[in-house]
Amino acid sequence: MKIAVKNNDNGHLVFDLCQMAAIKRPESIWIPDTYTIVDIKAAFVLIMEKESVLVDMVQQGFLQRYPNSILITAKGYADLNTKYLIREMFRYLPHIPYLYIGDYDPHGIDIFMNYCYGSKMTIYENCDLPFIEFIGVDARDMSLPYSALTPEDINKCQQVLDSPVIYAQSSISASSSFGRLQDMKRQHVIDMIRHMMANNFKCDIESLSVNSKLIPYIDSQLSLIDCRPIN
């Protein structure tokens, strides 16, 4: 698990590492198994599917444009430590956006759902993060580089559609605003998967980075929730 930390007065995260001194570092760092958050400031948290994309964003100056942000990646499917960290951050900062960005393919979407609702293997771990919102990549947003689905992708699409978490009954009342948001989130996932299968294409987020479209794309998505760069 890695986290990109911006060390300034606006967005940073400090850990007390048991017997070690607290740390503040401006680059990506490994988060240990045992820690205590002693200070955290951020306007939003952006969760990346891929480490390579996080590294590209840092190198392209994302943290200079958004010094009040925190970037996290579990390098694919989230391990429990990553999910516990995000849950702990939410305990300190429950009113900021927690956002996910990954591939527009069945694996990227399944990873998002795993963050939000876990899986059959983690049902008793109390680590679901239903407050995380999907901001991309959604190939319906713009003209993106794409490739055809493989037979394995098509099988994965069907697995996602058949997943219990898609149709699971929320413990939150469907009549509540939060319950309705969860229903909308699940429907959004269903719509994306069906769109993917109907059009037989997927989009790798790294293709945006190669074409220098990644930061502008994220800028456009963040602007929808009124998160804007400083330059």
Model-predicted segments: where are they?
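Nucleic-acid enzyme cleavage-core boundary/entry regions
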Residues: 1-99, 106-231
